[in-house]
Design a protein with these regions (language model features):
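A positional/architectural concept
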Residues: 13, 20-50, 55-66, 70-72
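Structural motif
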Residues: 37-45, 93-96, 182-189
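C-terminal accessory module of base-excision DNA glycosylases/AP lyases that mediates lesion recognition
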Residues: 1-35, 100, 117-122, 135-207
Length: 207
């Protein structure tokens, strides 16, 4: 099981408001009507997938993830990861470091937190206490598991590339320019991020 659910309650209103205030984004959105962010109901899956995807291509990450699914007999869960040996995990293509990080997440008690009671900043702080999780991975958790509406992961190379391509003819941009766009897109930066990713990738980004 993949632990997926698909409901993002604020999606339609976000699309409407963003389309009204940003013509460039409106054109991007119009190219992908009927598509939207797919959420993961299991936060462990989001974190594990994000670890797998660190510093490698989407295609390479997808290949490793499929091997991991086979190794885990279709059940990538905290308990199943704890049962698998390091050798079994490494055979999927995971580096020793990523194997260690995924084990850390599987064993962490932080995932038992009531996230509804936490701000985005508090969630990021808690997740970053787990070795292997940094701000980017925490942001993927906020987007793909919790559907927090206003996440703009500016440490994400793909997002930076998409913004520069669509808003500055592929040329580099300053922090002030990125911050200005973030203010324009707020409070719907998550929806913006998804469509900008989608404008670059042949398949939707998923964590």
């Amino acid at each position: 099981m993949d632990g997926q659910m698909n409901v993002v309650e604020h999606w339609n209103i976000a699309v409407q408001e963003l389309s009204e205030r940003d013509k460039i984004l409106k054109n991007i959105i119009s190219n992908y009507r009927g598509e939207r962010l797919k959420l993961k109901s299991d936060g462990f899956l989001t974190l594990a997938r994000a670890i797998v995807g660190q510093q490698i291509s989407v295609k390479a990450a997808d290949t490793i993830w499929k091997r991991l699914e086979i190794t885990a007999n279709g059940n990538i869960s905290r308990s199943r990861i704890r049962e698998l040996s390091t050798e079994e995990l490494r055979k999927t293509g995971l580096s020793s470091q990523k194997t260690s990080y995924i084990r850390n997440i599987a064993e962490s008690e932080v995932l038992g937190t009531d996230w509804d009671e936490c701000s985005d900043e508090k969630i990021t702080e808690l997740l970053c206490t787990i070795k292997g999780i940094g701000k980017w991975t925490a942001e993927m958790f906020l987007i793909f598991h919790l559907a927090r509406p206003n996440v703009l992961p500016l440490a994400d190379i793909g997002l930076i590339r998409a913004i520069e391509k669509n808003y500055n003819d592929g040329n580099g941009m300053s922090k002030e320019q990125f911050d200005g766009l973030g203010q324009k897109w707020s409070p719907w930066c998550t929806v913006t991020t998804w469509y900008l990713w989608r404008s670059l990738d042949p398949i939707p980004v998923e964590y």
